[in-house]
Amino acid sequence: MESTTAFSAVTSALGTLDVHIMAPYLWMLVLGFVIAFVLAFSVGANDVANSFGTAVGSGVVTLRQACILASIFETVGSVLLGAKVSETIRKGLIDVTMYNSTQELLMAGSISAMFGSAVWQLAASFMKLPISGTHCIVGATIGFSLVAKGQQGVKWIELLRIVLSWFISPLLSGIMSALLFLFVRMFILRKADPVPNGLRALPVFYACTIGINLFSIMFTGAPLLGFDKVPLWGIILISVGCAVLCALIVWFVVCPRMKRKIECEFKSSPSESPLMDKKNQELRCPILKPDPEDLKLPVDGGIVAEVKVPILDMVSVSRTEERTVTFKMGECDDPIEKEKLNSMETNIDQPTNGSVQLPNGNHVQFSQAVSNQMNSSGQYQYHTVHKDSGLYKDLLHKLHLAKMGDCMGDSGDKPLRRNNSYTSYTMAICGMPLDSLRNRDTEARPDEAEKSTVHGADGKKRIRMDSYTSYCNAVADTHMDVEAEEQEEGSVEDVETDRKSSSSSLEERHDQDKPEVSLLFQFLQILTACFGSFAHGGNDVSNAIGPLVALYLVYETGDVTTKAATPIWLLLYGGIGICIGLWVWGRRVIQTMGKDLTPITPSSGFSIELASALTVVIASNVGLPISTTHCKVGSVVSVGWLRSKKAVDWRLFRNIFLAWFVTVPISGLISAGIMALFKYAILKV
């Protein structure tokens, strides 16, 4: 009785159906709805990363915020734009007229296509590989058609277009993204003060974003919005008009507010920390701004030492101030040495103007180069500089200009393996020797040399006094002769690898967006991501719902060539499935697109989003085969390579490309297997 009631409820929910012809196949319709939801789930878990992966990776939005925005725009886009694209998936890949007398075969084929596509997309999501949902459903559709009707029903030109898109999409989008990012970097990012040029470019960027995305949405010809009745010249006129209006609003309203906000938040307080303080003395320091007073930071059970290091800049200014920094010194493990250190005077008040000369002849100048780093007991002391302080950022800039790659000492000196990229910066601050020293009489490995205490032949000790190793360690030890170096070839390889890692890290940090630049591009990237999500919902919901639409309309009308419109509630059903997949499993591919493939900043993320959207619009109108997923991956890789040649994970990119290559055959084989089961075991036709 209960099963009969459930059957009646499902039948009534599906509407008025032609039960006289297709009633025996109602089970196929119900099964199709279940598999279609799983397919929509897999699309949400994989393809939605195209829209918000870069925004999450650049830190503009959190993963939770991205899921909320994507859920809204994906659902709205699927309802408003999805009907048009579903027609292509339903009729554009195979010749449906061959199924006029065997409608049940077409229904079974739709189920097989959805199953094959869903399985491969879920597998790719598990492996964190972004693939094209369109290519999945195309391969699956071709797979079931080969089993059902052989080669005669397949439109092979579509398969050729897919193969071409593997190369055209990432290459074309990558070139356009690279050109846009080069423009942004040349005229904004590399300027001493990027704000003026950034504000001037802001109206242009907003206008391009609005114009391109609006044209893309209107050109799809969504019948629900009436866009199918608007001529091409009307679409162009509306898009250009909205873009110009947006540019005027941004120039007269947004830019003045943005300028005031930047001046208030960044210009008046440039990246300082409570470690900095000022004294009104005559100095040259136009970059750093003073703080009210010294701040001592206690370390539990340890020693707090205050080392005041006034900083000099290379450019003289009329109004100058002395800047000092308080260095925290952690606890010494040796009780005897701790007692000695407690009695030491570590407050340095008298600056002695000095500088550190690099091997290439450049100077990094400070008003206090602490020369007496080794005390009377033969100990080197370790000082921690907070990485968020203005002092650290100023020093980072100076050392970059002085080519830190040359700071590792002369050819006869062997540098130690450094724990992280902050070591050299702290060494320069404290005036410690830039050529790392080692013990003459020991053949300890670099890892052993970095232990807390090392006894040398001359009785000197090296004590680690830094309890914050995540920031920086100033390393020093006794000299090591050349013969010992030749005996430790493995150590030399480790040092060379670490030196390259340090220079790569320095290059990456230098290429990070300044706070004011990030503020300029943040909302732009969110805007492009929302537009992309809206268009993605309209395009990729068809990958999940297209076969279901064919299945439903064949069951309802009994005609495989029906011209009935796609029901809105079917599109909404697919949109809900996409959103659930995003919330449950979308973070995996979002991490690949936004973080694992290459680091992304707001400026590079905006370049990726806008250029890939422009590529899709141009290629679609010209008739070139294109894939949104491939465009985004190509843009991410090209911009990441421009920012830092070592920042791209080429092994991951290789895996992604291999996944693209096997998408069509794997989804096709799975679909063909399910179709063979239907044809020969269940339907027996």
Curated annotation (Swiss-Prot):
Q: Which GO terms describe its cellular component?
A: membrane
Report residue spans for region: Disordered. Answer: 438-458, 483-513
Any single GO molecular-function term of the entry would be: phosphate transmembrane transporter activity
Location comes to:
Membrane
Lineage summary? Eukaryota, Metazoa, Chordata, Craniata, Vertebrata
Report keywords, A-Z.
Membrane, Phosphate transport, Symport, Transmembrane, Transmembrane helix, Transport
Which residue windows does the record flag with biased composition (Basic and acidic residues)?
Answer: 497-513
Output one GO BP term.
Answer: phosphate ion transmembrane transport
What family is reported?
Belongs to the inorganic phosphate transporter (PiT) (TC 2.A.20) family.
Source species: Xenopus laevis
Record function comment? Sodium-phosphate symporter which plays a fundamental housekeeping role in phosphate transport.
Q: Which residue intervals are annotated with compositional bias (Acidic residues) in the record?
A: 483-496
Give the stretches traversing the membrane.
Answer: 21-41, 66-86, 106-126, 162-182, 207-227, 234-254, 517-537, 565-585, 606-626, 656-676
Instruction: Tell me where on the tree of life, at the top rank, the source sits.
Output: Eukaryota
Tell me, in one coarse class, where this protein mainly resides.
Answer: membrane
**Entries under InterPro entries matching the protein:** Phos_transporter (IPR001204)
Protein name, as recorded: Sodium-dependent phosphate transporter 1-A
- Xref: PANTHER family: PHOSPHATE TRANSPORTER, SODIUM-DEPENDENT PHOSPHATE TRANSPORTER 1
Signal peptide feature range? none
How is this protein situated with respect to the membrane? Multi-pass membrane protein
